[in-house]
A protein has these predicted regions:
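Glycine-rich phosphate/pyrophosphate-binding beta-alpha loops
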Residues: 140, 247-280, 359-363
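A glycine/threonine-rich phosphate-anchoring loop and its flanking beta-alpha core
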Residues: 111-207, 298-305
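Short, amphipathic C-terminal "tail helix"
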Residues: 345-382
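C-terminal and late-domain segments of enzyme folds
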Residues: 184-248, 252
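Gly/Pro-rich interdomain helix-loop hinge
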Residues: 271-348
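An N-terminal, well-structured beta->alpha segment
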Residues: 1-64, 381
Length: 382
């Protein structure tokens, strides 16, 4: 079996990594940066260290801080207009998945005709575009190092998933010092997103030895450190360990692919503007229990990675404990038990079925689902 690993050219980790990145970019003399971020992060002062470092090197930038959760094509077009009007030369994304995905889509438009959603699917971005630096503030989406971007087509009410090595950031930055003020609810949701990445990658039909190693270590780290990061956001060690865990999960799914959890989670996220990590967390134990008969031994290893003592257990029994461990972690960090608590009703489900089955994440799932089975999975998730 052949496989591909596509990663950022440079990855910087640890407290102070933002300063290291600015020193590096200063030597490259890329020109003027468009900083793509969320206005709330600016108000919280999380970008202050970036602004200070850029000014110290006399590096020009233009701030675009209009990003909102679940970015749309209209937002991407607005960001690209800001890039053009300010005569920028490269992009710095600062934030979680939404700012980084927005920046990736703007990067596409710097070298390819729009809209960015035209590149939904795998390997459709012909030209790489301008350099992109991605500074991650959550642990997380791993958007700072993956080939994925998710942009909503508002007219169709669908999340378009763009998967292409040409949108991988040139420089990925995981500086835990800017993660300390992230609220507990966001920490929980993004942490469960990272767990979903790791579990889906490990049981994916595209899994291979390199992704297996990364996925299992990611599961171990996230299970151990996510509750600590949720309980005390200023626990720097917990933030750093979660940053490592989510990055390893990104390395795994960036090559192995994802599965039905993401395929189904994209739909309520698009129609109800729900947090992506929460959608994943609600669906993860339900869909992996559906997948479990097709990957019993792998789910037994997931249980071990999540700290379950499987000594004396059969793989069948251990695989069931993996699902229980996922449920326990999700409840421990305060994830809602179902979509009905978030305003979703049975009437919403029918419009999601075909879109979920057509999602680019679905083909890597270890078990094929019919339309009726997808409906039942959604109903169970209510």
């Amino acid at each position: 079996m052949s496989f591909m690993l596509a990663l950022p050219k440079i990855s910087l980790h640890g407290a102070g990594a933002i300063g290291d990145m600015v020193n590096l970019v200063a030597n490259k003399q890329w020109g003027k940066a468009l900083i793509v971020t969320d206005g709330q992060l600016v108000k919280l002062g999380l970008l202050d260290s970036l602004f200070t470092a850029l000014k110290a090197h006399n590096m020009p930038y233009h701030l675009f801080d209009d990003v909102f959760p679940n970015p749309t094509e209209a937002l991407v077009q607005k960001g690209y207009a800001a890039y053009q009007n300010a005569a920028c030369d490269y992009i710095i994304a600062f934030g979680g998945g939404s700012p980084i995905d927005t920046a990736k889509a703007v990067k596409i438009l710097t070298a390819n005709p729009g809209p960015s959603t035209a590149y939904s699917g795998v390997g459709k971005v012909k030209n790489a575009g301008v350099p992109l630096v991605a500074i991650n503030t959550t642990a997380g989406t791993a958007a700072e190092m993956t080939s994925n971007a998710v942009i909503i087509d508002s007219a169709r009410q669908v999340k378009e998933v763009i998967i292409d090595p040409n949108i991988i950031p040139d420089i990925a930055v995981d500086d835990a010092s800017v993660m300390l003020e992230i609220p507990a609810a966001v920490t929980a949701a993004t942490g469960m997103d990272a767990l979903t990445h790791a579990v889906e990658a490990y049981v994916s039909v595209g899994a291979h030895p390199l992704t297996d190693a990364n996925a299992l270590e990611a599961i171990r780290l996230i299970n151990l450190w996510l509750p600590k990061a949720v309980d005390d956001g200023h626990n720097l060690e917990a933030r750093e360990q979660m940053a490592f865990g989510q990055y390893l999960a990104g390395m795994a799914f960036n090559s192995a692919g994802l599965g039905l959890v993401h395929a189904l989670a994209h739909q309520p996220g698009a129609t109800h503007n729900l947090p992506h990590g929460v959608c994943n967390a609600i669906l993860l134990p339900i869909i992996e229990n559906f997948n479990r008969p097709s990957a019993v031994t792998r789910f037994a290893r997931v249980a071990q990675a999540m700290g379950v003592d499987t000594k004396g257990m059969s793989d069948e029994a251990a695989s069931r404990e993996a699902i229980n461990a996922i449920r326990k972690l999700s409840a421990r960090v305060g994830i809602p038990s179902g979509f009905s608590k978030l305003g979703v009703t049975k009437a919403d489900i029918e419009g999601w079925l075909d879109k979920a089955l057509a999602d680019p994440c679905a083909p890597c799932n270890p078990r094929t689902a019919s339309r009726d089975e997808v409906r039942e999975l959604y109903l169970e998730a209510l």
